[in-house]
Amino acid sequence: PSAGTVEVFGKPLTGINRRAGYLFQGDALLPWRNARENVAAGLIFHGRPRATARAEADEWLGRVGLGAAAERYPHQLSGGMKKRVALAQMLALKPEILLMDEPFSALDVQTRSLMENELLALWSAKRRAVVFITHDLEEAIALGDRVVVMSAGPASRPVGEFVIDLPRPRDVAEIRMTPAFVDLHREIWQLLKGEVQKAYAAGAEART
């Protein structure tokens, strides 16, 4: 859309959405700051005293399993550890909405599974609203309460919405093996497959 309005919790959004936290695919950590200082940076920007911000940063690093890595710099961290620092950085600000754009897509399969379970555990503790963008249908089903399928671009739009009535708490590896998961995957894939084929066809036409 090129016109219209956006409301967040019933109020018009006219600038930066300060009630939302963001986690993207790319690495956004500051290379000259250690893990503690990266997490504390946003808190300091929002007015926390430096000592308080560092203490809160240590608390959040502990929650994501990196309490012992607080003084390590990004180049000393693995891909999964960097993502956990970024997750702590976002959650430390206590956003009411989490906007996550393919945050785990660059990770290996094992690390990705660990990070997905980490996200589920942290979500269970606070129950924030999460908008999670992914190209991985299995990931969408394993994590979500609803899956919205978008049409092939460039003028992408919602073409289907599915309720994910799988029980919580979940383990992303174990839930994939349940009959209910398989049934949901089959149902959603019937719609998604058509959009994937349209995208491939459009790409083939552009190359000829």
Question: Where are each of the predicted segments found?
Answer:
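Catalytic Walker B motif of ABC-type/P-loop ATPase nucleotide-binding domains
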Residues: 98-101
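Conserved signature/switch motifs of ABC ATPase nucleotide-binding domains
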Residues: 72-75, 93
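Signature (C-motif/LSGGQ) region and adjacent switch/coupling loops
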Residues: 16, 36, 62, 70-73
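Conserved ABC ATPase "signature" region
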Residues: 40, 44, 51-69, 121
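Short coil-to-helix segment of the ABC ATPase nucleotide-binding domain corresponding to the Q-loop/switch region
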Residues: 33-41
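Hydrophobic anchor residue at the start of the ABC signature
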Residues: 87
